């Protein structure tokens, strides 16, 4: 059976504590807790739906490190993090009822292209 979104979904306290700790820890990216933003990220290119507790949009690798360090703390062991690029997965890979770590909003630059050696260096959010 395919899970359907509930019209309302309460946010769980340990997620609020985690998101507040992100801000206190120097996270410079955006944090989306509102229902509208969460609903947009509840789907991808699949038929599945999962409403996340929140979404974070890291500005850079420093922000990603802050997220990872906080998630490793014992008081945040219940927090589920799921990375997301363009949401183009066809099997619901980027969907979660935890926190979406959306890397496509700010970390989407092509840093270097080496045509002769046929390689590129990109940030994690590059999807096209």
Predicted regions: what they are:
Residues 78-80:
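Beta-sheet entry/capping signal
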